[in-house]
Amino acid sequence: VLIEPMYVERHGRELMIGAVRDPVFGPAISFGLGGTMVEVIRDRAVALPPLNPYLARDLIRRTRASMALQPLRGAPAAAQEAIEDMLLRVSEIVCELPDVGAIDINPVIVTARGAVAVDARIGVMPVPQPQLLYRHMAIHPYPTELEGTFPIKGGRTLAVRPIRPEDAEREKAFIAGLSED
């Protein structure tokens, strides 16, 4: 048993990050206000991994906790990038380790300087062997193995890769620019 004093930060905001394994959808990542009032306040948004920076920001934006990250009653804005990074790391864990059944990080105390996980718990579950890669997930991670470069005329190279979520605006503009024929 390890007992330490509670981490206290003057302008710290208490948040929570979690993940659970749904039998149909696989891992689901949650984010919201944390601390001792987590069950009372019930501020939580959920997303399916894999997360990228855009999806992590969107997950944060969909909660009331996002307002607590802004400058508040004399406290400077909290380091949202630190929370985004924690969400991305949790996403990597549940994507790459199919035997992780649950993750509970509560509270995460975030300040202008960064974020600290004060209490964390990871639950494991048996996984039948052998298991196909990412079979435990509804959405598979971006297939980097399909990226490649090819030589073209003039000594240049052409980069070819699968579409990414951040390509959406450019794809819309491309489609809008096509002729009716």
Question: What positions do the PLM features span?
Answer:
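ATP-dependent carboxylate/acyl-activation modules
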Residues: 1-181
